[in-house]
Amino acid sequence: MRNHFQQDCFEILLRRAAAGDISRRNFVKAASLLLSVPLSLRANMAFAADQLVLCNWGGDAIQAYGDAFGVPFTEATGIPVKIDGSGPTEGAIQAQIASKTIIWDVIDADANVGIAFGKKGALEPLDWSKLSRDKVRKGWDREFVTPSYFFSYVLAYDSEIFGDAPPVSPADFWDTEKFPGMRTMYKWMNGMLEAALIADGVAPADLYPLDVPRALAKIEQLKPDIISFWGSGAESQQLLMEGEAAMGYIWNTRASLLSRDTGGRIKWTFDQAFLNPSSWITLKGNPAGPATAMDFIASTQKPESQVVLFEALGNGPANPEADALIPEDQRHLNCVSPEAVAVQINLDQDWYADNYSAALEKFLALVSA
């Protein structure tokens, strides 16, 4: 699974910094946490490696990551940070494992990727003597993956079109008679099969294992009313901003920006949204050593740092202790607040770990037809 959301987070961060919405200091803090590079570590922390290699999704973000967090980290620890922007695709990870040539120390990945490679015996187990189980969401003190932050696929809509009776559920999203207008959905499938099945009458508690053929058939019914399957956060935002789409399933971070930038014209809801974690993994045989990787991952659990990331990007904190530190006027934007979690649906990462590739192939064949 490709972590397009992590790429999008940095685009949002750069945009907010350029607009003066966040200070340079908070920009550096947020960028550092985003890729699990702490700005400060204990002065007596020992490192066995000459460098730490982080793998992300590349492009212009390589230089931005270096400026934002690589230099401060090197100044704090003496360890150079190398950012590999070639992209941690499942194929690239598998190639390193097969060749026994591991070049990445910390990898940003969706949780299902970590679960899948953990089952294959390819990952270092997390060292919970360094990490705190009290600083993760319930059920996420797992063997091979732990969240860095959370995000949601939410239903956003144009309130000028729908007024006081807007679409608020997957059933409404599929009801083109009651809610006319073009739609947009996520190109890489996450949450879209679930939305289709709920619209087709499946109860959220009965979603898994997903009935992929049934979900695809439901999406095919809606295709004439889908203007685009978006592949980037910027694309999803543009479609709604310019009125090409009347509604869409998009990331909550982009929905929040849209609401602000349109003066509330674009609204959105956590009701029956789909909650997903971004997670850290470490391959066995990583050059810097597992202890160093665990020190980095443990450092990202600090609640104050996670609030910096929330305020910069809108990502839900992985550490529940951070919720109380979020300014009161922003808590309604937190996708992992108790109120938001109560009305959302957790994407089943274990199902995705076992079925993602096969299901995605069928999904892409449908959307590209």
Where are these regions (language model features)?
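N-terminal secretory signal peptides
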Residues: 1-26, 33
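Conserved C-terminal helix/tail region of periplasmic/extracytoplasmic solute-binding proteins
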Residues: 13, 18, 339-369
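Early extracytoplasmic/lumenal segment of secretory-pathway proteins
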Residues: 49-116
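Extracytoplasmic ligand-binding site segments that recognize negatively charged/polar headgroups
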Residues: 59-66, 102-241
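A ligand-binding cleft/hinge motif common to bilobed small-molecule-binding domains
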Residues: 114-118, 241, 247-264
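Periplasmic-binding protein-like
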Residues: 151, 213-222, 260-284
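A bilobed periplasmic-binding-protein/Venus flytrap-type ligand-binding module shared by bacterial periplasmic
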Residues: 154-161, 197-202, 277-290, 297, ...
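Mature extracytoplasmic/periplasmic domains
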Residues: 283-344
